[in-house]
Amino acid sequence: MQPIISVSNVSKTYASGLRALERVNLDIRRGEIFALLGPNGAGKTTLISIICGIVTLTEGTVSVAGYDIGRDYRVTRSMIGLVPQELTTDAFETVWATVSFSRGLFGKPRNPDYVAKVLKELSLWDRKDSKIMTLSGGMKRRVLIAKALSHEPQILFLDEPTAGVDVELRKDMWDIVRALRAEGVTIILTTHYIEEAEEMADRIGVMHGGKIILVEDKAELMHKLGKKQLTLHLQKRLDALPDALAAHRLTLAADGNEIIYTYDTQGERTGITALLKDLNLAGIRFRDLHTTQSSLEDIFVGLVRQRQ
């Protein structure tokens, strides 16, 4: 299947000489939720801005549903909705007016029924006649999503969609994103909340230093790069680990009351059997144990550190 977005060898150098992107290649599949992760300055917003036609690329090509973003600008832009990171809204306009106006900017005919549908799905219907300046930060962000959806785009970019939003509203946003995907909208999000990507994304892309350093299915990424930890809760506190256990690369934690063993989930052998045998020989007894899996945040931090 042809990707809905194809980025090929894209580079961007600003007038100041800053090289923001370096030969980026990326394909986005139709109907997926794709999370683009990376530290500040990695190039995420620049890449999104290029695809959306806001920033001009220096080298390379970008196509949307087979249309070139430069040659077929109006066609590609009409397929894309963008929710920016900043809360840029018309403070003195009503919710209804600003969403309807956004639809008109893309040359779409008036469609009150569709605008009403969007506002209801985003829980904005009761505030449709309210001036935007009277809304909370979370509601203003919903208005931005409504504006981005006003012209019925096939693709929705969410740049830090839950920045400054409380936990309850963040989970509401997650539900909104899932519902949009269920309707066939392709969604690309950038986020500093790694749990957000872990919760929603089908695939993960990681950027660092203006480059894409990894693109992987989320489940496969966590399987390949994730590690597990075995935590042993000791019967008696230890001041230090015996030299006989040095080969296991253990960590003494919880003020000497826990031993933590980290192992690779891809290894043929975990080493747990040998560890338990050596603990027994060393006279170390434990009262309980449990295992934990690396989170996406652990994997992301590890990938970025490798590049530093």
Predicted regions and their residues:
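Conserved catalytic motifs of ABC-family nucleotide-binding domains
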Residues: 152
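Conserved ABC ATPase "signature" region
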Residues: 100, 104-127
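Catalytic Walker B motif of ABC-type/P-loop ATPase nucleotide-binding domains
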Residues: 156-159
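Short, charged/small-residue-rich alpha-helical element at the C-terminal edge
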Residues: 230-303, 307
